[in-house]
Every structure is written in structure tokens, then in C-alpha cells.
């Protein structure tokens, strides 16, 4: 009898913890308020832990950096004074949004930044503490977080969309899309504004989900506060956590892998979508699943967060230069003639890469992104070439507008030792550019280094039956200047001083209307790589050396000669400006360029291109008399 009682007691002791464990598992499975995907810090487990250890759950009210969490219930006489929630201890998180916090206000016309207006912060009038906060926001984000935190995450945007877009009719049976937003330590107000603009301006029947891909953020507001805030959307917003810092390309691929929508729409984490942005994109894909579409990208000022809306007539299309850098240019005349309305979708040779929609199955058929690409850079051109050369179409849709915060620098830190953009670009060139790859290699002084195995990507191109890059240039981007037509190219060296000085653009590739200077020759190409066209232009891809009577500048090439026409004599080394008849020289210390009267024996007017094709110069009549 005693033995029987002992066995019974033992069974009870064993069954009680088993019962509680099963209960916890059941409640965790049925309380899926935060749609966290593959996370190591599941929200349900955190709430359970907080309830078992109440002191651990204490959290201060957060303003501007995360959602305020409702305070702990008051415990008196071991009794919790709160309304009982279904699901026991695993109750859904509650939110106590501070009504005085400007970022959560909705529908207040007097709110800062409404209708996309600028928020101007006079830093000189801030207290020492507020100045420190202002500076920290700038340092962490490379945009004015202080101004952003004064603007509602629900703010309204300009309503001056093109009138024709307001009456445009779209297919009634459009596919559903997953919107994928990758981020790393994005500012709270900016990230939430991006998400809310998607949720509030996309018809619910078209929005499958929003997938937030966290690329291993380490700021507190991107962790539990973000999970708890997004749980209010009932599974519409999901969070995917990367287990290590992977970069934009791999983060996007992970997002695509879990997305369930028929169409994938990619956005950056510092965007705002305008009303009616989604329907025009999905309509084009509905008509042809091999069409990849981009919205018009409006500029959100990185300092004031003013939304600059552009009209359809001024839509630009994407291009690239032989440094394999993306650029914008106006719609070519040949395409403009084929359009009946300014709001008609327009073909684009390339995409900027941050904002676009693509049929998921078609994306997979194209091989998604090159898995050998690291971090970011070059993926937009790879996808653009692949779309056009392998039977698809790439368009910009003027009735779809999304604002984007364009920063002047990147706030992110990466491991050093490898030029990631260069490595990605070499892989791109090897697979897609055919013999034209030499034009890129000349710009990096033919220093290729280790770019990995590309055999699988070449096989992909072969299996897809893609066209040649020459076909792409002839049919999709005939406006691009081809370096093979150059009379001379490479560095432009002057040896009057030592070390020798080279003509140097001294600005970023996309910066124009800036002075040209000289710098010690470095042999790396880049800012010192120039081309002399058959028309006498000294080109840096789409920029030309221009002289209008004051400084020697780089301006966008206009193809009309004039101030951009130069006559080069390789024998004497003179670069003579056709209009002014002056010659390009430099000061005695080699520090500055100057335009002076031509003198045959002046070594400071003696310039040598690294490569010169005399036969081509004679052929095009580009060789002036000595």
C-alpha cells in the first residue's frame, strides 16, 4: 500500500510539469500576434518570460525611437489588477502611444511635414542636449533624423499627381504582391513611415504581405519594440532576421524566398509611397509577366524631408557608363516619338535597383541575383541586362510614384580589404558584356583580381538563350557612347613637373558642372580616365570637358561641339579649344589648370593620352595640322 502511494505521488510529480510544459507550448502556438519569421527571439517566448519575471518586463516610455509599451499592472496582495486576457499569460502586447509624440499623430493638417512639406530645423536654437541628439541622428543615418522624428509616420503627401493618372483604368483582376523591405539600423520614424505608406496606400486585396528583412541590426529599437509595434497588423507585416550581416543582395534573396505573393515588390527602408502607386505597376505585369516595372522615384530631401513630386513629362530613364555606374538621362527622342501620352510607360535600358516589381516566377527563371555578388552594387545592372537580353522588358511607369531619401554618403560600416563593388562589376562584365567588358577593365587598369567562379552564371545565360550585348547596345541603348569609337583614351599626362600630373575630374562620377584639375598620376584609371571622341570631345563617359571663358569644367555632353570641342595634336601634345583658340596648360607648380595662348615650346601645354589611334584620327578628320 505504501509502495502504491509512493508510485502515485511520483506520477503526480512527473505529470504536473509535463502538463505545464504542454500548456505553454499550446498557448505559444495559438498566440501568434507577432509574425516573426525564423527569429531567435520569438515574441511569445519573450512575453511569457516577462510574465514569469515581471521585473524583466519593465520598460520606459519611448518617444521617437520605438512604440511605448503599456506599463506593468500593479500587483497588490499577490493579485494582478488587470482585465483577464484570453490565452493566459501570453496576452497580445498593448500599446500606449503618447498622443503628444508627433510621429504617431494622424490626420492633423497642422502637423509638421504634412503634404510632404519641408521641416526646417534651426540647429542654433536647440539646447545642448537637443543639438547632441540632432548630431547623433545625422551621424547614424546620413539624413536628418531629428526632422524626421517631428513628422508623423502617417503623414500625407502632395496630391498633384498627373490628371490623366487619376482617371486611368486598370485590370480588375490584378495579382497580389509581397512588398519586401530590407533594412539595417534604420531610424524608427523613417522605417515606420515606409511601412505605413505601403499599408495605407495599397489596396488590401492587392497586398499579400510586407516582409521586413532585418540585416543584422544591433540598435535596440529594431528588436523587441519593432516586433511589438508590427504585431498590431495581424500578420500582414512579417519580420525576417538575418543571422549575420549579409548585405542588401542576400537580404533581398532571403525575403524573396519566404514571400508568398505572386509578384515581388522591393522598396528601400527610407521611402514613402504615393496614393495609387501600386495599381499601375501590377497592371503592366498582369499584361505581361516578363515585364519588370519601376515607379518614378521622387526625391525626399535628406535634411528637411520635403517631398519633391515630379510630373510625368519629366520622367527620366536609367542608363549606365563604362565604369558600370548607373545614371539617369532623359527619354531618347526615338522613344518619345512612340508615346502618345506623357503617362505612358517608357522603356528603360537599366533600373536604379532599389524600387521595382517583378513576377516572382519570372525572377526565379532569370536566376534572381548572382549569388556570388557580395553586399551591394552591380545587381541592378546585372538584372537590367538580363531582363532585356533574355526576352523581357524593363519599364518606368509614370503614374506610379515613390519618394526616396537620397543620402550624400552611406552611414553603414563594412569589413575592409575587398573592393566589393569592383568584384561584383567584374563578375557582371564577365558574364554579360562579351567583348565590351574591355572598356570597363581599362577603367580599373585591368586589375581584375579574384572574382570567383562564374561558370554557373554563364550556363544560366546559355540556358536562357539570351542575346548578345551588341544586340542590347544596338536595340535598347544606342545612345551610349562606345569607347571603341575614341581617337584617344586613358590618362592624360603632363610631365612638366615631377611626379607627373594627370588631368583629373576630382569629383564623383555623377557630379557634373564642376572644375577639372590636375592630380599626381596614379595609374588606377577612375577620375583620371578620359576619352577623346571623333567629334573632339574630351569625355568621361557622359560628361565632357567644357570651357566657356573662365574655369575648365565638366558638363553633361550635349553633342553640339561648341565649348566642348577640342583639337588634339599627339605630336606636339597640344590640346587646343576650338572656340577660344586657347590651349590647355597648367601653372608652374602643376597645381591648377589654365587656358593660355598656345606656345609650341611650352612644356606645361604638353599633354599625352595613354593610347592614341592615329589611323582613327585621320579617318574621322580628328587630327589637326601641326
Curated annotation (Swiss-Prot):
Domain (Ricin B-type lectin): residue spans on this chain: 488-610
Residues given in the record as substrate binding sites: 215, 245, 269, 376, 407, 412
Cofactors: Mn(2+)
Membrane-spanning ranges: 12-31
SMART domains noted in UniProt: RICIN (SM00458)
Region annotation Catalytic subdomain A: where it falls in the sequence: 174-284
A GO BP entry: protein O-linked glycosylation via threonine
Residues engaged in binding Mn(2+): 268, 270, 404
Catalytic EC class: transferase
Pathway: Protein modification; protein glycosylation
Top-level taxon: Eukaryota
Subcellular location: Golgi apparatus membrane
Residue intervals annotated with topology Cytoplasmic: 1-11
Example of a GO MF term: metal ion binding
GO cellular component: Golgi apparatus; Golgi membrane
Catalytic activity: L-seryl-[protein] + UDP-N-acetyl-alpha-D-galactosamine = a 3-O-[N-acetyl-alpha-D-galactosaminyl]-L-seryl-[protein] + UDP + H(+); L-threonyl-[protein] + UDP-N-acetyl-alpha-D-galactosamine = a 3-O-[N-acetyl-alpha-D-galactosaminyl]-L-threonyl-[protein] + UDP + H(+)
Sequence similarity: Belongs to the glycosyltransferase 2 family. GalNAc-T subfamily.
Domain comment, as recorded: There are two conserved domains in the glycosyltransferase region: the N-terminal domain (domain A, also called GT1 motif), which is probably involved in manganese coordination and substrate binding and the C-terminal domain (domain B, also called Gal/GalNAc-T motif), which is probably involved in catalytic reaction and UDP-Gal binding.
UniProt name for this protein: Polypeptide N-acetylgalactosaminyltransferase 5
Organism, scientific name: Caenorhabditis elegans
Amino acid at each position: 500500500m505504501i509502495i502504491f502511494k509512493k508510485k502515485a505521488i511520483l506520477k503526480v510529480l512527473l505529470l504536473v510539469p509535463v502538463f505545464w510544459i504542454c500548456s505553454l507550448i499550446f498557448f505559444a502556438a495559438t498566440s501568434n500576434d507577432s509574425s516573426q519569421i525564423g527569429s531567435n527571439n520569438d515574441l511569445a517566448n519573450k512575453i511569457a518570460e516577462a510574465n514569469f519575471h515581471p521585473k524583466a518586463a519593465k520598460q520606459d516610455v519611448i518617444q521617437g525611437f520605438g512604440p511605448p509599451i503599456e506599463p506593468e499592472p500593479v500587483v497588490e496582495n499577490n493579485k494582478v489588477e488587470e482585465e483577464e486576457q484570453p490565452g493566459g499569460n501570453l496576452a497580445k502586447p498593448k500599446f500606449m502611444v503618447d498622443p503628444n509624440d508627433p510621429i504617431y499623430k494622424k490626420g492633423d493638417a497642422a502637423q509638421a511635414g504634412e503634404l510632404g512639406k519641408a521641416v526646417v530645423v534651426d540647429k542654433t536654437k536647440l539646447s545642448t542636449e537637443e543639438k547632441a541628439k540632432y548630431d547623433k541622428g545625422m551621424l547614424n543615418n546620413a539624413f536628418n533624423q531629428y526632422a524626421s522624428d517631428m513628422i508623423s509616420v502617417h503623414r500625407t503627401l502632395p496630391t498633384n499627381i498627373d490628371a490623366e493618372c487619376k482617371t486611368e483604368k486598370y485590370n480588375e483582376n490584378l495579382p497580389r504582391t509581397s512588398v519586401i523591405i530590407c533594412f539595417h539600423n534604420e531610424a524608427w520614424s523613417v522605417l515606420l513611415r515606409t511601412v505605413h505608406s505601403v499599408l495605407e496606400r495599397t489596396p488590401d486585396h492587392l497586398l499579400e504581405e510586407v516582409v521586413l528583412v532585418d540585416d543584422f541590426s544591433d540598435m535596440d529599437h529594431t528588436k523587441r519594440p519593432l516586433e511589438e509595434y508590427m504585431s498590431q497588423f495581424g500578420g500582414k507585416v512579417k519580420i525576417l532576421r538575418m543571422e549575420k550581416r549579409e548585405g542588401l543582395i542576400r537580404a533581398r534573396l532571403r525575403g524573396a524566398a519566404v514571400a508568398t505573393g505572386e509578384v515581388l515588390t522591393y522598396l528601400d527602408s527610407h521611402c514613402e509611397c504615393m496614393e495609387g502607386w501600386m495599381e499601375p505597376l501590377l497592371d503592366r505585369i498582369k499584361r505581361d509577366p516578363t515585364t519588370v516595372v519601376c515607379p518614378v522615384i521622387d526625391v525626399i530631401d535628406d535634411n528637411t524631408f520635403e517631398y519633391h513630386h515630379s510630373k510625368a513629362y519629366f520622367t527620366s530613364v536609367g542608363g549606365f557608363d563604362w565604369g558600370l555606374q548607373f545614371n539617369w538621362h532623359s527619354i531618347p527622342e526615338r522613344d518619345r516619338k512612340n508615346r502618345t501620352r506623357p503617362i505612358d510607360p517608357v522603356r528603360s535600358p537599366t533600373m536604379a535597383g532599389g524600387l521595382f516589381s517583378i513576377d516572382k516566377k519570372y525572377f526565379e527563371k532569370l536566376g534572381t541575383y548572382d549569388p556570388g555578388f557580395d553586399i551591394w552594387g552591380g545587381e541592378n545592372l546585372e538584372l537590367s541586362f538580363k531582363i532585356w537580353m533574355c526576352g523581357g522588358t524593363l519599364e518606368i511607369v509614370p503614374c506610379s510614384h515613390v519618394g526616396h531619401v537620397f543620402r550624400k554618403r552611406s552611414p553603414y560600416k563594412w569589413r575592409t580589404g575587398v573592393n566589393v563593388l569592383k568584384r561584383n562589376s567584374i563578375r557582371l562584365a564577365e558574364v554579360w558584356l562579351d567583348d565590351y567588358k574591355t572598356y570597363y577593365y581599362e577603367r580599373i587598369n585591368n586589375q581584375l583580381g579574384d572574382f570567383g567562379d562564374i561558370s554557373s552564371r554563364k550556363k544560366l545565360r546559355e540556358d536562357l538563350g539570351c542575346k548578345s550585348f551588341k544586340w542590347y547596345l544596338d536595340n535598347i541603348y544606342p545612345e551610349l557612347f562606345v569607347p571603341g569609337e575614341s581617337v584617344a583614351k586613358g590618362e592624360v599626362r603632363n610631365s612638366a613637373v615631377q611626379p607627373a600630373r594627370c588631368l583629373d575630374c576630382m569629383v564623383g562620377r555623377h557630379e557634373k558642372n564642376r572644375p577639372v584639375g590636375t592630380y599626381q598620376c596614379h595609374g588606377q584609371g577612375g577620375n583620371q580616365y578620359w576619352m577623346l571622341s571623333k567629334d573632339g570631345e574630351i569625355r568621361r563617359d557622359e560628361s565632357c570637358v567644357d570651357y566657356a571663358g573662365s574655369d575648365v569644367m565638366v558638363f553633361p555632353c550635349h553633342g553640339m561641339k561648341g565649348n566642348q570641342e577640342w583639337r588634339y595634336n599627339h605630336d606636339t601634345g597640344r590640346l587646343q579649344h576650338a572656340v577660344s583658340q586657347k590651349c590647355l596648360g597648367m601653372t608652374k607648380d602643376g597645381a591648377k589648370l589654365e587656358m593660355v595662348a598656345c606656345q609650341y615650346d611650352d612644356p606645361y601645354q604638353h599633354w599625352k593620352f595613354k593610347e592614341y589611334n592615329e589611323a582613327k584620327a585621320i579617318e574621322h578628320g580628328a587630327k589637326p595640322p601641326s
